[in-house]
Amino acid sequence: MTDGHHFNNILLGGRGGTNPGQFKVHSGGLAWKRQGGGKTIEIDKADVTAVTWMKVPRAYQLGVRIKAGLFYRFIGFREQDVSNLTNFIQKNMGVTPDEKQLSVSGQNWGGIDIDGNMLTFMVGSKQAFEVSLPDVAQTQMQGKTDVLLELHVDDTTGANEKDSLMDLSFHVPTSNTQFVGDESRPPAHILWETILKFADVGSSEEPVVTFEGIAILTPRGRYSVELHLSFLRLQGQANDFKIQYSSIVRLFLLPKSNNPHTFVVITLDPPIRKGQTLYPHIVIQFETEAVVERDLALSKELLVEKYKDRLEESYKGLIHEVFTKVLRGLSGAKVTRPGSFRSCQDGYAVKSSLKAEDGLLYPLEKGFFFLPKPPTLILHEEIEFVEFERHGAGGASISSHYFDLLVKLKNDQEHLFRNIQRNEYHNLFNFINGKNIKIMNLGGDGQGASGVVTDVLRDTDDDAVDPHLERIKNQAGDEESDEEDEDFVADKDDSGSPTDDSGDEESDASDSGGEKEKSSKKEASSSKPVQKRKHKARDDEGQEKKKPKKKKDPNAPKRAMTPFMYFSMAERGNMKSSNPDLPTTEIAKKLGEMWQKMSGEEKQPYIQQAQVDKKRYEKESAVYRGEATVDVDSGNESD
């Protein structure tokens, strides 16, 4: 890259273990983003005060200290990366990286270096370990020579690790020359006072504010929510969670449409754990019209020094607004509210289903959020494409009132939002198209995909003219079957073939007959209730929806196969052998995905096979119709 360097699989070190992500250093600073979404760190070059390199097991570690006193550790660089990044940082940030060495001797005596909010234990000139002082919840003297540090133990730290550091102690002899004291204040006392200046001591005492009886949907229950200086606590009858503010990535304030409740979502990284279940989102539900008044338990000095322009002495207003403002002021997390999207009922979300759960899908400015269960956040930048799908293929009239939205991520993960009302299509399409997200079956790639959306929106009462929709309707054929083969994936190379008609259930004359035969068939359907066309009309009138299928003539010619069918026959065996545990429906789905990704040249052999079979079918159909006509005529004459 001309403007910087980009690295994958770089670990961010911290008390919660290491998390892999993408690291980028550019002329304006550096950034790290967790793999799969979540925590993001952006550092402006003007805030960088020191940079260090250290050789750690199997890799190199880049340490970055900023003006606020925070220290970040990025692990996973190769030896050849060190010189390139060193030159780039010197040139663009004006900071010369220092080289530190890691002590591996196992020696447990040495010196203590406190720089900003980091405590480093040094063995000679080498570093043994580091402790972030804001992670210290309590410190106390033990006798005259020992200093005990107790660290915050919360339900997010350690979610990815089996073990977590809880406490450690330092023995400072009276002969120590680094922390000079006297008889009343020995060296250990001097160290204790120094740590007190940076540690988060006292934050575990009385909460700043408490909200009683709050309904939390995930993890489910009613909790008392306590907001402390550095963490929040959820106290329920069966569960008790403690969450560091440093684990909060973002807050979401999302009103429910036509409902007296409002969601407040706390997104965490790392998540909290309950048994074997991880909860990356805490979904809180407030009564929208509830009004509260709260006074904060903060001294005026602390309010002015640390929380100036972030918190007030007291709050009065809607409970979800008060809660969000106080939590934002204490944690520093950003708040996301609904953006420009509006549903057909002027709401902020559309009703849909994810897996087996009904909920609301919120199209936001930078992502989609499905609530309340399972809470699913999808960022726009993680989406490879979206695809509109019809609700069902069984021909039932109710299916025309709903459609599905498939979201395919760049990591090959898929989310299918089902049962979205048909009248929400235009709003969703305009929003997604405005965000420049690729819409798979609205790009003119094939008539089959276009026909899916045409089926979804057929007979719509919306008078608004959508040029994209009109183009789709013009492209889509009128000959599509209502009961297609379950493995069939329509494509521009085979759409419009005779196999699109449901020949198993209709008269064979409709398979390849001309327009005259089709019109005569429609006229005959009014007087012959056994015809399928009459069956469709009775569905539209709300009467009997289904009638017994007409028995197929065993002498009728076999229908022509589509290119995809030939492809499926050729590849199904390979798919089964390589994935023996894959269900039949998943095999069909995988084959469909493979077919869609194939180029025109790759599809050509199967297209040629289908063309040959199509000619065979047309010839056999002509012969079959001729023989059937002779039999009918001769039968009438004999009567």
UniProtKB/Swiss-Prot annotation:
Residues 513-525 have a biased composition (Basic and acidic residues). It comes from the Eukaryota. Keywords: Chromosome, DNA damage, DNA repair, DNA replication, DNA-binding, Nucleus, Phosphoprotein, Transcription, Transcription regulation. GO terms for cellular component: FACT complex. It is found in: Nucleus; Chromosome. SUPFAM superfamilies: HMG-box, PH domain-like. The keyword Lipoprotein does not apply. Pfam families: HMG_box, PH1_SSRP1-like, POB3_N, Rttp106-like_middle, SSrecog. Residues 477-488 have a biased composition (Acidic residues). GO terms for molecular function: DNA binding; histone binding; nucleosome binding. Component of the FACT complex, a general chromatin factor that acts to reorganize nucleosomes. The FACT complex is involved in multiple processes that require DNA as a template such as mRNA elongation, DNA replication and DNA repair. During transcription elongation the FACT complex acts as a histone chaperone that both destabilizes and restores nucleosomal structure. PANTHER family: FACT COMPLEX SUBUNIT SSRP1. Component of the FACT complex, a stable heterodimer of SPT16 and SSRP1. This is FACT complex subunit SSRP1. It comes from Zea mays.
